């Protein structure tokens, strides 16, 4: 009886609120609120010696609790923390050729190694056993990034009895990645690090001129950590027609991750708070993912634990990962596949069009970015859920054309502090932060009112796709967010 009474009272309170309007709601989003929330994340990180928000660490726990408490105290949402256990990994490393040290980054979940050995250049992209020369045994395999997951390359190198592996980038600049937790049916990993394209090419030239020896040391640490997603759904609105949006709460080891992805989660939090002034026709679900940087673990866990009925209640998913890059471009996920010949599930084209129309309405240029599997939309796409979102670029280099569009610096990364210690409050572009947060608010208000542009989903197709959700090596290549010209989070750096 008490629950029925409370539901009746809640319905009455919500009924007294005006329906959220896409024309007006974006104006409720203020820069000062975005910056206040971002500062809180930096404070969490800098309160501890690690100065980061890696999943399962104290600053990340503080982040999760902050989001939970801020949403809970509104009284507008049903909020819970979803517990899960994931394997954490970190490593120190050195790579030398003679007395010269080469910058290298150990891939997440790599085993340890200490070896001095010649380099063996692997044919093609190292994605099949035939690519590994017979004399790779006991040597360090040098493999080009591309085509298959880093975990596959590492396993194949181990099968060829390589002493260790080096993967070099296929675009300018350094690289890192994740192997994904080891899969017993695949075989053990070889120790593996990533280096830049330039350093990879130097090693190839030395190897072609004669043998070249490297000294590689990797000290890898791993432990299971308990961590949490935060889920908050409006108490009002149709719970069978859910508008879902999300971003990830964790950073890499190197820094506090205030753009990657503090910008996305704080934008969503500010929007969630502002939404409490209004009523909605369709339920809105805010999702805050853990352990994205280790292979989209939180979002994969969440989606894999939904049955077909619950999956079909989610009419669409919007992803916001790095929306305030300092040298930004305004990028929209290519839902219709017109730019990258890879469309999202039915309804994704309409999401892309909504964001395009919004930017057009305020005379802002925009470009598409690829659904490359490198952020938390992947599990939703693989389950047939229409998806979309925004991105402002990571380690990718801004072109002259894009610099002219947004007044940025050509020849410079969209985010020069991507996955680095400098991804703090000073790394945020305030203009991009506010523009994209207002665009997000517009989308939320639109779909909270009307989902008629998004086709109903089919249970059978969802079940068919679901089996593919938990991929053996996590996301794809480095979050280079493969995004068109922006690259991005190695969230995905599972795939070369």
Curated annotation (Swiss-Prot):
This is probable leucine aminopeptidase 2. Residues 1-16 form the signal peptide. The keyword Secreted applies. Binds 2 Zn(2+) ions per subunit. The active site is at residue 292. Residues 475-496 are annotated as: Disordered. One of its GO terms (biological process) is proteolysis. Its EC number is 3.4.11.-. Optimum pH is 9.5. Keywords: Aminopeptidase, Glycoprotein, Hydrolase, Metal-binding, Metalloprotease, Protease, Secreted, Signal, Zinc. Its cofactor is Zn(2+).
């Amino acid at each position: 009886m008490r629950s029925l009474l409370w539901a009746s009272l809640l319905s009455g309170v919500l009924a007294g609120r005006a329906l959220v309007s896409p024309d007006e709601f974006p104006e409720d989003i203020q820069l000062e609120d975005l910056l206040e929330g971002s500062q809180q994340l930096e404070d969490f990180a800098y309160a501890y010696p690690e100065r980061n928000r890696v999943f399962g660490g104290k600053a990340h726990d503080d982040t999760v609790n902050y989001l939970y408490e801020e949403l809970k105290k509104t009284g507008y949402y049903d909020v819970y923390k979803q517990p899960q256990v994931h394997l954490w990994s970190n490593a120190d490393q050195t790579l030398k050729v003679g007395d010269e040290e080469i910058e290298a980054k150990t891939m997440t979940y790599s085993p340890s190694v200490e070896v001095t050995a010649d380099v063996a250049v692997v044919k093609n992209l190292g994605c099949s056993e035939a690519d590994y020369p017979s004399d790779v045994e006991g040597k360090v395999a040098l493999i080009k990034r591309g085509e298959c997951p880093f975990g596959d390359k590492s396993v194949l190198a181990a099968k060829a009895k390589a002493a260790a592996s080096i993967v070099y980038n296929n675009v300018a600049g350094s690289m890192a990645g994740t192997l994904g937790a080891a899969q017993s049916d695949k075989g053990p990993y070889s120790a593996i690090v990533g280096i830049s394209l330039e350093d990879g090419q130097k090693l190839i030239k030395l190897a072609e001129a004669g043998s070249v020896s490297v000294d590689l040391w990797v000290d890898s640490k791993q432990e299971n950590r308990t961590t949490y997603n935060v889920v908050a759904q409006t108490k009002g609105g149709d719970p069978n027609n859910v508008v879902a949006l999300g971003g990830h709460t964790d950073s890499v080891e190197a820094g506090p991750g205030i753009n990657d992805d503090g910008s996305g989660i704080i934008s969503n939090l500010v929007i969630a708070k502002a939404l409490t002034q209004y009523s909605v026709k369709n339920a809105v679900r805010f999702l805050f993912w853990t352990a994205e940087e280790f292979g989209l673990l939180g979002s994969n866990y969440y989606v894999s634990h939904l049955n077909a009925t619950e999956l079909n209640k989610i009419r669409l998913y919007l992803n916001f990962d790095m929306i305030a890059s300092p040298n930004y471009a305004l990028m929209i996920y290519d839902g219709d596949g017109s730019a990258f010949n890879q469309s999202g599930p039915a309804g994704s084209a309409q999401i892309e069009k909504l964001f395009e129309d919004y930017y057009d309405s305020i005379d802002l240029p925009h470009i598409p970015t690829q659904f490359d599997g490198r952020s938390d939309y992947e599990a939703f796409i693989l389950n047939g859920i229409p998806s979309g979102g925004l991105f402002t670029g990571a380690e990718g280099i801004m072109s002259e054309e894009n610099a002219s569009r947004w007044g940025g610096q050509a020849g410079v990364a969209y985010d020069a502090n991507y996955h680095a210690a400098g991804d703090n409050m000073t790394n945020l572009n305030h203009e991009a932060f506010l523009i994209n947060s207002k665009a997000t608010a517009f989308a939320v208000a639109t779909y909270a009112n009307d989902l008629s542009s998004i086709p109903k989903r089919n249970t059978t197709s969802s079940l068919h796709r679901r089996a593919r959700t938990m991929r053996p090596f996590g996301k794809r290549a480095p979050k280079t967010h493969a995004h068109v010209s922006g690259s991005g989070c190695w969230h995905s750096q599972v795939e070369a």
